[in-house]
UniProtKB/Swiss-Prot annotation:
Identification of the protein by name: Rab9 effector protein with kelch motifs
Domain of life per record: Eukaryota
Taxonomic placement: Eukaryota, Metazoa, Chordata, Craniata, Vertebrata
Function of the protein: Rab9 effector required for endosome to trans-Golgi network (TGN) transport.
Pfam families, sorted: Kelch_KLHDC2_KLHL20_DRC7
Kelch repeats: from-to residues: 49-95, 100-146, 151-200, 204-253, 254-303, 343-366
Keywords: Kelch repeat, Repeat
Amino acid sequence: MGLLEVLDPEDLPKMSTWYALVPRGEGPSARVGHTCMYVSSSEDSSKGKILILGGADPSGCYSDTHIIDLDNHEWDNPDSEGLLPRYEHASFISASNPGNIWVFAGAEQAENRNCVQVLNPGAASWKSPKVMGTPPSPRTFHTSSAAIEDKLYVFGGGEKGAEPVADTNLYIYDAATMTWTQPVTSGDPPQARHGHVLTALGTKLFVHGGMAGSTFFKDMFCIDTDTMKWERLKTKGDLPPACAAHSSVAWKSYIYIFGGMTSTGATNSMYRYNTETLLWKQLKFDSACPPARLDHSMCLLPWKTRTNTDNAEKLPCKAKEESNLKECSSATSKTLEQGIVHLCFIFGGMDTDGELHSDCCVTILQ
């Protein structure tokens, strides 16, 4: 596995290339089951932050918070207290109060959790608010991509070992009202599973992969939260193998997945799913790729670059690949004039030989 080129602050990344992101200072130790999120700033001049929450290694679970301050490209380790140790949990930011960081579920060494905790802007400690309604049973539920507006959507999750919870209901946590609800759904829902990705895009939620016992899944489901009807999608193209413990991000009309565990071991492949054409495409890279991994975390990173419209030539248009990319060139130029490109950011995870990672890797979305 070759070394990745380092992407320095405000550098414009090349297409089809993986980079290492190397902030100054001491970052998190190698771990699995953590979550990561990009947190924007209310100040236009700010580049925002990346938060990494919790996780675990063979010695136990973490309750720490690590931050990449993108303005100074440094790690920050705040002294916030009160986060219960947990891994393979969910995290999200509510749209109506974007300063609040929420976590749900996960596990520690003795048991699974189903509690909700929140960190308010400027607060020194996490709070465990009293919530209304009936929450899902304790479970692992590893995602940071399953929220729409103020609502976290929960489907499936882990019970113990390789077994999922038997519950196949959909649950909604509304951060604005701090209330759990369980909507009535129709259609063809996924069977019980854990280690799947649950990704929100617009009003829809997409479920891919996961596992139950020794069975790995490669199917794709969708539920529109306006109609609450499940649909099993008939996808085509470069179908990803059956896998679990992978990660996902949504951008434009696409869902990207990276890594995970298959029946033959961990992978470092990346796929793009077009939600409009139902087409999967395996992405190819001109550089080395990050080491294969599972149980890592991934988020969408708006990356501010030195503004230079001449750089548009460095981002070749792939319009011939899919018809809905015909305006790629003009969109690319506009993005570069604004000085922003969108990256996929991954941190941590492990391979099937037990090696844990503590690296930050990025690639531009295409």
